[in-house]
Amino acid sequence: MKYDFDEIIPRRHTNSYKWDSAADSDVLPLWVADMDFRTAPAITEALADRVGHGIFGYTRVPDEYYEAVCAWFKRRHGWAIEKEWMIYTSGVVPAVSAIIKALTVPGDKVLVQTPVYNCFFSSIRNNGCEVASNPLVYENHTYRIDFEDLERKASDERVKVMLLCNPHNPAGRVWTREELMQIGEISLRHNVTVVSDEIHCELTYPGHAYIPFASLPETVTGHAVTCISPSKAFNIAGLQIANIVAPDEEIRRRIDKAININEVCDVNPFGVIATMAAYRKGEDWLDQLLAYLQGNYRYMKEFCTEHLPDFPICKLEGTYLVWMDCRTLATPSAELEHRLTREARLWLNAGAMYGKEGEGFMRWNIACPRAILAEGLERFKDFIVHKT
């Protein structure tokens, strides 16, 4: 392997949200979704060149940026994005919030598929809307969509938007074309706009191809809006950059107004440079990263099968977030998170933060050197041995 993903890079005392948020330095953080790997060399080299210039004034988004994004998605995913459809923004979470603001009024409902990314809930409620849930069905260590329930929920006249997570965090599903088609047909039938968070789109594994929702026929997608970013795949979340893709001109105008309502979307020069480098020169690094992450998942699956048979993990089709079933402990997940942090010195995410359907589950971030993952699994095993 050309890139050394086994290298352990100290991250404490770098103001890392992941590593420096714990009160004690011996807590192993396998929680929030950023990776413990250096980003692609092409990105660090491009950033170093930009830093060397020494002037960091107001920045515009050049045509080359849009060309790099469009070329990447066309080549790698077969999705033809037009430059005019894109809105630059500082992240997917503020993008989702602005889209909800643009497409709803207070009192409307926004549909989600729980368990789901926790920031969806705050983005909905902070805009004065209500959360409507289409719970995913957990069976055989994976999740499927209850389409009958989705039809019922979408038929509510107060439901105006559906937030789709594709690939899905934390379930690890990569929705198939057939599943996405059904979502589109139901949403279109009930005049519900699909807003697809596709931030994990590059992180899929063999046999599970990412299908951009908006790449489906327009007769299915309607006025769909998509949020994309290189931040997860290339580990550049701190550079705060993302794109909204909205083919419909009127919807795009409303979203652009909502984003700029507080005039807080100035361009980050480093995010622009990093994105262009990632999409132009980062593909080989990404492919090797995916192979390493797949190896981490295999390692964890084998470890759990041998040492933690009562704690099955979901089949991982995409993302680097593994969903573990801990219901055998009959312990609320928030309490389990607290006890693991205090007693095992291991920080995982409590499943309940992703909706009540996540209660009893824990989310692991396996985007780290294998030695760190192994240490985390040993700590979890020791905790279970002493607890039981």
Q: Which ranges hold each PLM region?
A:
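Conserved N-terminal alpha-helix of the aminotransferase class I/II PLP-enzyme fold
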Residues: 50, 57-90
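N-terminal glycine-/charge-rich "phosphate-binding" loop or analogous flexible N-terminal tail
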Residues: 1-12
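PLP-dependent class I/II
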Residues: 4-6, 22-28, 33-49, 81-82, ...
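An N-terminal-biased, well-structured beta-alpha scaffold segment characteristic
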Residues: 11-25
